Every structure is written in structure tokens, then in C-alpha cells.
């Protein structure tokens, strides 16, 4: 699974739909996903709310990458280092669900996840060119 992360209105649902159309991807949630780490690795989970997309499937899939989205006129992608990745991810976590005093546990989980899951920054256009740019970077075929 590829998880798109961004503030509301940036284009998560748009990029997910483009991947569905151009790469045959299955979208398990159009807004937010849960993430777990277990003996089998890092997994993304559909959640029972979907934002504006209406897509929320009760599915889990191995997480292969997280992509922080930004809007741009030209497509640019780069892999984020650990500190950059944690900062970007923390901006998009539902902090309301983290109990007081548990923030360090959340950061520790992110650090563990980053050992196997790369995080990218994709500043992109809302069209097929963005899909191609990301697919090329992730080495995903047609």
C-alpha cells in the first residue's frame, strides 16, 4: 500500500483516484488510514470514516511507502530523511487520539516504522504525470 498524507484539500483523494484509474490500485480509505507494526511488518488499515471521498474499506495491506503531498505546477519528488519524515508525519497525525504523556511512544513507533517504510515528499499536479513520477521513483511498473 501507498499512503498519501497531507492536510485536508491538498489532493489525497485525487491522487488515490488517479492511481486507481491509471495503475489499477485499490483505494482502502480516501482520507486517513490506521498504521500498525507487528512481526510481519508495517500495515495500513482502512478506518470506518472516509472524509469527503466516501471510501472506507475494512482492509489491511502491507505499507510500502508514505507520500507527503503538496500541490505544484511541476512534479517533484524526493525521499525525506528521518527527522524530516517525522516532522511531516506528526503534522498529519490525529493528536487528539494520543493520551497525555504518550507522545514519546508515538514518536518511537514512527522511528520504528521508518526503518522499513520510506517517506517521500511529492509536490505534484492533479493528473497522470504525478502518478508516473511517483511510480518511477517507487519502481512500480505499468
Task: Show which residues each predicted segment covers.
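Conserved lysine of the Walker
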Residues: 12
Amino acid at each position: 500500500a501507498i499512503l498519501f498524507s497531507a492536510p485536508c484539500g491538498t489532493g489525497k483523494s485525487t491522487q488515490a483516484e488517479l492511481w486507481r484509474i491509471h495503475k489499477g490500485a485499490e483505494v482502502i480509505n480516501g482520507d486517513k488510514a490506521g498504521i500498525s507494526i507487528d512481526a510481519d511488518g508495517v500495515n495500513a488499515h482502512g478506518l470506518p470514516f472516509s472524509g469527503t471521498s466516501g471510501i472506507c474499506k475494512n482492509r489491511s495491506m502491507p505499507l510500502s511507502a508514505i507520500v507527503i503531498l503538496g500541490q505544484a505546477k511541476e512534479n517533484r519528488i524526493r525521499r525525506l530523511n528521518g527527522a524530516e519524515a517525522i516532522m511531516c508525519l506528526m503534522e498529519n497525525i490525529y493528536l487528539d487520539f494520543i493520551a497525555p504523556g504518550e507522545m514519546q511512544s508515538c514518536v518511537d513507533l514512527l522511528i520504528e516504522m521508518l526503518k522499513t517504510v520510506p517517506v517521500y515528499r511529492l509536490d505534484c499536479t492533479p493528473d497522470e504525470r504525478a502518478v508516473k513520477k511517483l511510480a518511477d521513483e517507487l519502481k512500480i511498473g505499468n
